[in-house]
Amino acid sequence: NAPIAMEVIDAAKPYIDVLSFQDFRDPVKHLDAWHRKTGKPVLLADSAGIRWRSKAFYKPNNGAWYAETLEALHKNPGCIGFHLCGAYQRNKARRRGLLDEQENPDSEHVDLMKAANEKITRWMEKEFSH
């Protein structure tokens, strides 16, 4: 989440097809800005709505945040994808993830994520099924 100099991006532009970033602060705003600055497609390579500063032992991957972020990124014509960070098995060492130690899904959050993905899928099918 450290700033990157525009000079670095400008130097790389002739050699790249897509800009790919991690962003745990404001990915919707930042990816929109990078797309507008460069004209390049952007990919949210790693992000999550985890409350990192929470005192809770387990920190769920926030399904509502995911759904809101996915919908907002979908409105960015330059955004080509979103990779969720922390979609691992939750255990006592790695205290976040979409599956618990017995591989049971965090249904509350997974269901919200699934519904968001299905909404985008329906839009894609309608838009491109000609």
Label each region the model flagged.
Residues 15, 85-130:
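Aromatic-rich peripheral "rim/lid" segments of glycoside hydrolase catalytic domains that contact
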